[in-house]
Each structure stands twice: as structure tokens, then as C-alpha cells.
Design a protein with these regions (language model features):
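Short secondary-structure transition/capping segments
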Residues: 97, 352-357, 367-368, 456-466
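Membrane-integral, polyisoprenol-dependent glycosyltransferases
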Residues: 1-349, 353, 385-389, 424-427, ...
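Signature aromatic-anchored transmembrane alpha helix within multi-pass, membrane-resident enzymes
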Residues: 341-382
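N-terminal secretory/membrane-targeting helices
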Residues: 15, 119, 169, 179, ...
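Alpha-helix N-cap/loop-to-helix boundary motif
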Residues: 300, 328, 332, 365-370, ...
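Short, solvent-exposed mixed-charge patches
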Residues: 489-491
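Short periplasmic/luminal acceptor-recognition loop of GT-C membrane glycosyltransferases, typified by
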Residues: 375-486
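Extended hydrophobic-aromatic, low-complexity segments
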Residues: 322-325, 336-337, 345, 368, ...
Length: 491
């Protein structure tokens, strides 16, 4: 199969994997309602500088994903499909970019195609590329920067590579506008480890090898600096401190106690059995098999460092989530594909002595094609049937439909101490901002003002008098209560 045919096949498979049935289910879990709500609020307010949630600045990360989601809402309407488009395109571009760059590295079309296919069909990569959020964009930015860096510094060393360095800058720009300091640290730690290995191996320090990525990184940070300047214009130093220190350094060091997701240092070690499913075994066996070749094979060394250095960085961070491993997926796919290629050569060498090996060699195309189609069919089935079924437990639509029904009746519905997911879901589905109350005194005053006033609240236990429950809706493991003042029923 030619490289062109493979690339077209990958394009078709990736479009199927990332876009088919993308909008057949509602916003689910915690991240999707929150990010979609921020995007809807940006669309409604027309404030494209400061991301807001429930009319409050929300600066956990820079706003690239929210910009794209808000633009999609403006173009296609406020639907789950629209706000998932950015992640889906990020997944698609990551797969196609990996294939193209591996071919530029001189790898056979078969190896490049298998690596790209394994990336597209890693369970965590696939699922996160179909969800609202910034993680797919972060993975695209990090992989773009690292692949371009390796091409410019190793493959085309001592040759003009301005295009590759500009691609490197684009990757850094995407990753930093998606995740801030982490988007700079993840490719940065790999590049640092690579340059140290290069210096040790050649027993000399080449200053230009260090200065070149630094200069193009400065170029890449210009879009982030422009946004920070505009943010400063709207909110001053407090907003800059929140995005640069509290939500970046604070989350890494653990000093920001409200960030959450705190896990022990061994958290990611316990997640290794599921990190790169279904290709885990090939990844880890490949790392072991290639360990003695690393210093002689710069290509294998680079992708091993992509895994190890980023894994170490994430392990040292206080805030940990399984989704953060998504940026390691391209390197894992490359190592898995390279080891699969080694296994294929071993089977071919034994074909003369083993009937089973000979059968596999004779029918390898049919076997591989069938296996790939079965994997794709499995993911398509999950997208078509499993995700919509989860709506019964995870969708906020029944809750927001109830809010709308009360509003149609002339009731004034307000939120009491809403969680991020509740605030996001309410603004996304209602395409409007509900009033919010923070203190219990505000709640009492609101309910006493009119018998038509209804408060929506989340509670682990049923609210007690003087509150009266008029309805409740369960979303996942959380229960949301619609309450009025009990005194209204005393008459």
C-alpha cells in the first residue's frame, strides 16, 4: 500500500472515529458542562478576553478551547456537537501529523500507518478527542512542538529548517494557549532531557542547539502574552496572578488547595495498566526491548524520552488526572508500532520452521485488516450506543428542562451555591444566566420575596424546613433539589 493510499485510509478512519455520532448524546460528567457553559457565556456576553462561568472570571487555563467552542456555537448553534468539534479536529490533526512526520523521519509507510492507527484507537485518546475540553488541543500542541523539534534538530540538523521551527512555534502556541505553563513545561522537559543526552553523548555543549528552541519558544509565546495584556486591561493584576500563579504554579506545587485532583506520587504508576489501552503490552514491551539501542538510535531515544520525561513531570505535580497522560499517547503509539514491526519480522523469520508463522505471513494483510476493522467497529459501537445510554444517568438535560418548565409557568428560578458543572449546564442549555445566591441569608431573602421564587441547589441530604422540596433530579451520583419557602404552604 502506497503512502498516499495509507494517508487517505487514515483520514477516512480518523473521521469515522472522531466525528461519527459526535453529537448523539448530551453533555456528561463534570468537564463537559463546565467548559461548554463558559463557551456559551462567552458567546452571549461577547467578551472574548476573560472566560466567565456564572458571571465570574474562570481562569484555570488560557481560553483557546473556549474560543474555538464559542466560535462553533456562533456558527452552528449551541449544541453538544458544536462544542465537541474542537477536540475532534485536534484528534484528527494529531493522527495525520504523526503519520506525516514519521514518514519525514524516514520510517516505512507501514510503521507510520500502524503508529497513527494505534494513536487514533488508544481508548483514552479516542474518548477525550470526542469530549468538550482542552486536553485534545494540549496533546496536539505538545506533539506538534516535539515532532517539529526532532525533525529540525535531528533529522535536518545543519540544514535549513525554518518551516519546521515555525511549526514548533505553532505547537508551543497551541499548547500554552490551551493549558498555560503546563503547555510549556511538557514539551520543555522533553527538549531539556534530549539536549542533555546529546551533550553527554557528544561530550560537548553546543550553545546554538539550546538557543534555537528557546528563541522560537519566545516567538510562540507572543499570542499568550497578547491575551495576558488584554486580560490585564480588563481585570488588572489579580486576574494575571490567578491564571499565572494560582492556577499554574499553585496546581503543580499543591499550594492552591481548591484546585483538587490531588493524588499520591504513585498515582500514575497505578494507572499504567490502563494508560494506553488496548496497546499497553506493546508499549511496555517495546520500551524494554529497545532499552539497549537508545544511545545508538536517536529516533528511539527521542520517543522514549517523550514518554519518560513527561511521565516524571506529571508524577511530580500535585494535581493529577488520568486525562493528563493524553499528551504521552503519540510517543506510546510510536514505540508500540515499532515493537509490532519487530514482532512481525520475527514471525516472518520463523515462517520456514513454523506452520502457524507461515500461515500468518501468507495471510498477514487479511488478518491485520480484519483486526483493525474490528477495533474500529468496537469504538463505533460504543459511540453509537453506549454514550447515548449513559445520558439516562449523566445528562443535565432533564434538570435544565425542569428549569425551563418552571420559567414557562412564570416562576423565577435561581441557583444556590452552584457547582461548576451545574452553573455550566444551566447557562449552556438555557442560553441565559440564572441569578446566583451564595449565602443562606440570600437564599432566605430570595424565597421570602415571592412564592413564585424557586431555588435550585445540590445537597447530599434532603433540605430541611423552612425549605420545601417541590422536585428533585438525580444526575450521576448527585441529587439536585428545587425548593421554595415552606411557609408558603402553611396558609
Amino acid at each position: 500500500m502506497t503512502s498516499r493510499t495509507l494517508s487517505l485510509s487514515l483520514l477516512l478512519l480518523s473521521v469515522m472515529l472522531f466525528f461519527v455520532a459526535l453529537g448523539n448524546h448530551q453533555l456528561q460528567n463534570s468537564t463537559e458542562p463546565r467548559v461548554a457553559g463558559i463557551a456559551m457565556e462567552m458567546h452571549l456576553s461577547d467578551n472574548w478576553v476573560t472566560p466567565m462561568l456564572n458571571n465570574q472570571p474562570f481562569l484555570e487555563k488560557p481560553p483557546l478551547s473556549v474560543w474555538l467552542d464559542a466560535a462553533a456555537i456562533r456558527m452552528f448553534g449551541g449544541t453538544p456537537w458544536a462544542v465537541r468539534l474542537a477536540s475532534a479536529f485536534a484528534g484528527l490533526f494529531s493522527v495525520l501529523l504523526l503519520f506525516r512526520m514519521l514518514r519525514l523521519f524516514g520510517r516505512p509507510a507501514a510503521v507510520a500507518g500502524i503508529a497513527a492507527f494505534m494513536l487514533a484507537t488508544q481508548a483514552s485518546f479516542w474518548s477525550n478527542s470526542r469530549q468538550v475540553g482542552e486536553d485534545a488541543l494540549l496533546a496536539l500542541g505538545v506533539s506538534t512542538a516535539l515532532l517539529a523539534f526532532f525533525y529540525a534538530s535531528a533529522v535536518r540538523k545543519n540544514k535549513p529548517a525554518i518551516g519546521a521551527w515555525l511549526l514548533f512555534s505553532l505547537g508551543i502556541a497551541v499548547s500554552t494557549l490551551s493549558k498555560g505553563v503546563l503547555g510549556l513545561a511538557m514539551p520543555g522537559v522533553v527538549i531539556f532531557a534530549w539536549l542533555v543526552c546529546e551533550s553527554v553523548q557528544h561530550r560537548r555543549l553546543v550553545i546554538t542547539d539550546w538557543l534555537r528552541p528557546a528563541m522560537f519558544t519566545v516567538l510562540a509565546l507572543i499570542p499568550l502574552f497578547i491575551w495576558l495584556y488584554l486580560l490585564y486591561g480588563q481585570g488588572g493584576v489579580p486576574l494575571l496572578k490567578e491564571v499565572l500563579w494560582t492556577n499554574s504554579v499553585g496546581r503543580f506545587s499543591g499550594s492552591f488547595e481548591d484546585a483538587g485532583h490531588y493524588e499520591p506520587f504513585y498515582y500514575y504508576l497505578t494507572k499504567l495498566p490502563e494508560a494506553f489501552l488496548p496497546w499497553n503490552a506493546l508499549v511496555y514491551l517495546g520500551l524494554w526491548h529497545f532499552r539497549k539501542q537508545l544511545m545508538a538510535n536517536r529516533y528511539l531515544l527521542f520517543f522514549s524520552l517523550c514518554l519518560a520525561a513527561q511521565f516524571l513531570l506529571l508524577t511530580l505535580a500535585s494535581s493529577k488526572r488520568m486525562v493528563y497522560l493524553m499528551s504521552l499517547a503519540p510517543a506510546a503509539a510510536v514505540l508500540a508500532a515499532e515493537y509490532a514491526f519487530v514482532l512481525g519480522e520475527l514471525v516472518q523469520a520463523r515462517a520456514a520452521r513454523s506452520a502457524m508463522a507461515a500461515f500468518f505471513v501468507r495471510n498477514r494483510r487479511v488478518i491485520m485488516t480484519t483486526g483493525m476493522l474490528l477495533v474500529v467497529a468496537g469504538y463505533m459501537s460504543a459511540a453509537q450506543w453506549l454514550a447515548p445510554r449513559a445520558d439516562k444517568q449523566l445528562s443535565f438535560l432533564p434538570l435544565t428542562d425542569k428549569v425551563h418548565a418552571l420559567q414557562v409557568e412564570g416562576r423565577h428560578v435561581a441557583l444556590y451555591q452552584p457547582s461548576e458543572r451545574l452553573a455550566g449546564a444551566s447557562v449552556f442549555y438555557s442560553q441565559s444566566l440564572l441569578d446566583t445566591m451564595i449565602s443562606s441569608s440570600d437564599l432566605s431573602a430570595f424565597l421570602e420575596r415571592s412564592e413564585d421564587n424557586v431555588a435550585l441547589m445540590e445537597s447530599l441530604s434532603a433540605p430541611e424546613p423552612p425549605l420545601r422540596i417541590i422536585d428533585r433530579v438525580k444526575v450521576g451520583d448527585r441529587t439536585y433539589y428545587f425548593v421554595t419557602q415552606a411557609a408558603a404552604a402553611a396558609d
